[in-house]
Amino acid sequence: EQTGVPVKVVTAASGTYDTTLAAELDKSSAPTLFQCGNQGAINSYGDYCYPFDGTAIMDQMTTDAFNLKGEDGQTLAIGYCYEAFGIIVNKALLEKAGHSIDEITNFESLKAVADDIHARADELGFDAFSSAGLEGSSSWRFSGHLANMPLYYEFRDDGVTAQPATITGAYLENFKNIWDLYTTDSATTGAALATATGDESEAELGEGKAAFYQNGTWEYSNLSGTFNMNPDDLAMIPIYCGVEGEEKAGLCAGTEN
């Protein structure tokens, strides 16, 4: 309710949010607002989080499905931005290669299209997937987002509703399916993946050097603005990994908290 209050905004460099937050919270003037994007962050920083239960903003929320809670059940982080991730597609490049996004409905059809583009990369002037770099600014796409795929299907089958102590790994082969495709049907393979960055992967799609790029809706402004991509050429498909019935799958969706 008070206006005119000076606010200092600290922006962490790419891939350094966790270390930056830890350093800021250790200061006498710790942050008033900060992000806890997953349960791991709640475990690390929950003691600094003021519970939202009983506040006006909680009364305004239509669902608490995306909120994060502490061990005592208190709501410690709430969703403020709804977003989705999957495989971003340059439809114009697909068409140039003689394919259509409509023919991709599962892992088998995705692999067929990607294999064909990769085999003709020199002729086409672009490859199938942008680099799946393992440098810190890129690796979170796979250690976090991609890892959701086998976990989602396992938890769905087993009726898991809370963090389990162990996993069965029932769908780890499916994780391997899509990871192998990312790292095979790409111009960046092998040892080069260790140092390939997130910016490089983004630029490969943005500059028309790759047809597929795993990331999320937050990439729209960079791709349409920085790289001047035609919005009509952009689409996103689910991350297919060879699970039965995935033809009916949608995008992975959630919130920043």
Where are these regions (language model features)?
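A local structural motif
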Residues: 3-12, 98-102, 181-196, 209, ...
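Short, solvent-exposed loop/beta-turn-alpha elements that line the ligand-binding surface or hinge
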Residues: 53-65, 103-105, 129, 133-136, ...
